[in-house]
A protein has these predicted regions:
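Catalytic loop of short-chain dehydrogenase/reductase
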Residues: 125-165, 175-187
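Catalytic Tyr-X3-Lys loop
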Residues: 90-109, 127, 151
Length: 252
């Protein structure tokens, strides 16, 4: 689909990978609204890119329903995620271990439920940003890998509900397959693993191959939205040296 004048809502779009996506969407003519907590970062973003902004907690169920009811987006990107506490399995408290579930999965549940129950209009697309940790785990990040895999599952479950109710909404998972320095999650993860392995964070992330800075990530997500060959798949891996690859096809 062409993104020109499409109404797009991006959660967690004020920094990191989300910001790179917002920049790419604006460059392709989309009308973007960014939902995030930090008012100062949102103010700066509004001035620099001309996007609309809403300061809100993405785990606030009431705010979630209000925002989608008011904006009725053509495309919804659920990118917001908390930086997980790092440490080995023998070090993390239950609160630290479950932090990604309390934030990322809770937010995903509320936004997906709102998209299904309002519902969004037929033809809408919802992208759920997961992580490469959903494929291989992340032993230094507690429950993070499991939380990101759950979001992938939830996109699949949401498609099932959409099909059963004949809503015409497509849900897809976006899976960045490498850590990206300059992002909260990427910096925390790379630092933790690099320290454990006795190397610098830059050396650790080099193991993933070609880098994928936030704007490049954004361009790859735009290609998923814009290229018809990605319209039907369920999950797509994004990587600097391999581009976009389908990880899971949509259920027949």
């Amino acid at each position: 689909m062409s993104l020109k004048d499409k109404n797009v809502v991006v959660t967690g779009g004020s920094r990191g990978l989300g910001l790179g996506l917002v920049e790419a969407l604006v460059a392709h003519g989309a009308r973007v609204t960014v939902v995030a907590r930090g008012a100062a970062a949102l103010d700066s973003l509004r001035v620099r890119l001309g996007v609309a902004t809403i300061s809100a907690d993405v785990t606030d169920e009431t705010a979630t329903h209000r925002i989608l009811a008011e904006l009725r987006p053509d495309i919804l990107v659920l990118n917001a995620g908390a930086t997980p506490p790092t440490g080995g399995l023998d070090q993390l408290s239950w609160a630290d271990f479950t932090a990604p579930w309390e934030h990322d999965v809770k937010a995903g549940l509320y936004w997906l439920q709102a998209a299904l129950n309002q519902p969004l209009k037929p033809g809408s697309r919802v992208l759920v940003v997961s992580s490469g940790a959903a494929e291989n785990g992340s032993p230094m990040s507690g429950g993070y890998g499991g939380a990101k895999r759950m979001l992938w599952f939830m996109a699949k479950y949401a498609n099932g509900v959409s099909e059963k109710k004949r809503l015409g909404i497509r849900f897809q998972a976006i899976v960045p397959q490498q850590m990206v320095l300059g992002t909260g999650v990427g910096d925390a993860g790379a630092s933790a693993y690099a320290q454990a392995m006795g190397m610098k964070p830059e050396e650790f992330v080099a193991r993933f191959g070609a880098p994928m800075p936030p704007r490049e990530f954004g361009d790859k997500v735009v290609s998923v939205l814009d290229d018809p060959k990605y319209a039907e798949g369920l999950a797509f891996g994004l990587k600097g040296d391999t581009g976009v690859t389908m990880l899971e096809a949509a259920a027949a």
